Amino acid sequence: MKKLFVVLTSIFIAASAYGLTNSTLIDFALTGNADNLQAGEGDTNEVVPVAENLYNDNWVVWLNESARLTENRRNSYVTNVDSKGNNGAWEAGKVLGVRVHFPLAAWNSYALVKPVYELEMYGGADGTKYTEGKGVIHNVGEIKSISSWVYGRNYLISYFVNLQNEFGELKSYPMGTVYFNGWRQVRWENREYLPNVRDRVLVREPLYPRMIPSVKLDSLGFYRTKDTKGGDFITYVKDVTLEYDVVVVDFEEDIDDEATWQLLKTENDRKQAIESARIREQAELRDLEQRRIGDGTAADQGAAANTGAADTGAAQEQAQ
C-alpha cells in the first residue's frame, strides 16, 4: 500500500524531471499463458482470479443492441492464437484472436472486446493485481500517445481503445482502421500534448490527500459503418502500450502524511470494497446461469457465457 501511495507533486514538475514513460497496458502474449496469471502472495481469497478473468480464451465480445441478434452473438467470440513473432519483432507466443459477426443489413454497428469481469483498479493486496501488462497502469498523467500491434485482414473497420480513469470516466481513443494485411502498429497521438515545459500553464497542485491518477482497459472497440459489408470480421491484437507523463515523484519528505492520517488507504479500501461487491454479484449470476444450463453441450455453454456477459454489459450501460 505504501508503495502505491507515495507523495504527489505537480504533474508539470514530474514531467520535466522524469520525462515520458512507456508502459504496456495489456500484453496478450502475457495473458495468453496461464502460468503468468497465478495469484500473488496475499491474493488467495480474491473473488475472481486473474487467470479466470484475463486468460485470452475467456475474453468476451459484446455487440451493440441493434446487432445483438442470436446468430451474431453465437458467432462473435475470441480465442488464444499462436503468433510466430512478426519476423522477430517479439518472441513467438500468444495473441488475442477476435471474430465478430456483424449484421448483414446495412446499418452502423460495433463490437467491444473485453474481459469477463471489469478490471479492478485497486485489486489485490497492494492494488497491483492487474498491473504490469494486465490492464491497469497507476501514476498516469497526460497521455501523449497510445499504440497497439494489430493484425489486419483488409477490413474497413475502425479500431478504438477504450480506457477508464480512477473516477470511472470512460474515454475512447481512435486508432484508425484495420484496412491492411498483416501486422501493423497503429497509433493515437495527443495533438494537444506540449512537450516543452515553457509552453505549459504551470500551477501548484494540492499534494495530500489525492488519489494517484490511473487508467485501466475497459475494452477494445471495432466499429463498422453501414457502407461496409457485414458478416464475419477477423483480426488479432498483440498489445496496447501507453506513452505518458508520470504524476507521482517518489522522494524523501520530512513528514510521512500517509503514515499519520491514512486517508489514501481508507479511500482505496472503500473503492476496493465497491469493486469486489460488483464483481462478486456478476460472478454469482454467471455461476447460477452455468448451473442452469449445465446439461448442455460445451459449445452451447461457451456461447451462453458470452451472451451472459453481453447482457451484463447491456444492463450496466442502461443503468448509466
UniProtKB/Swiss-Prot annotation:
Keyword Membrane: no
Principal subcellular localization: periplasm
Keywords: Bacterial flagellum, Periplasm, Signal
Biological process annotations from GO: bacterial-type flagellum-dependent cell motility
Subcellular location: Periplasmic flagellum; Periplasm
Cited Pfam families: FlaA
Region of interest called Disordered, as start-end residue ranges on this chain: 290-320
Signal sequence annotation: 1-19
Chain intervals with Low complexity compositional bias: 295-320
Top-level taxon in the UniProt lineage: Bacteria
GO CC annotations, alphabetized: outer membrane-bounded periplasmic space; periplasmic flagellum
Protein function: Component of the outer layer of the flagella.
Quaternary structure and interacting proteins, as annotated: The flagellum consists of an outer layer composed of two sheath proteins, flaA1 (44 kDa) and flaA2 (35 kDa) around a core that contains three proteins flaB1 (37 kDa), flaB2 (34 kDa) and flaB3 (32 kDa).
Name of this chain's protein: Flagellar filament outer layer protein flaA1
Gene transcribed to yield this protein: flaA1
